[in-house]
Amino acid sequence: LTATDIERGLKLLAWSREDLLKTVEGLDAKKLDQTYPNERWSIAGILKHIGGAECWYLDRLELALPREQIPGEPFARLKVSRARLNEVLPTLEGSKQVAGVDGELWSPRKVLRRALWHERDHIEHIRKLL
């Protein structure tokens, strides 16, 4: 990743998270925990999944926080996982690291790309449920 890639990535991550939080703003606990037919998760479950996925992506490069530091509450998990991603990305400038994990290759660029795509995908998922 170049410095420009990281700068742009951090901006896109911030905008995406802003969109996510605006999408769920004002939803009460009942709505967050509501289940939907043919859906794996409630909205709270989707939020928890997004945060968990960011931790998982970082784990591919051995950069994740220890599991015991990852909150279970969805909004806290989102905050902690994104803070870690924002902390780690600038340290990856110029990194040529490629890690093979479970038969899949991971690089800093792939982690950034997946985190961005995954959150956008689930923002649309939540919007469809609402």
List each model region and its residues:
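Active-site-adjacent scaffolding segments
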Residues: L1-E25
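Short, mixed-charge, low-aromatic patches
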Residues: A3-I6, R40-A44, L78-S81
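Short, contiguous alpha-helical
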Residues: L10, L21-K22, A29-F75, G100-L130
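Short, Lys/Arg-rich amphipathic alpha-helical interaction segments
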Residues: Q69-L89
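Transmembrane alpha-helical segments of integral membrane proteins
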Residues: E87-V98
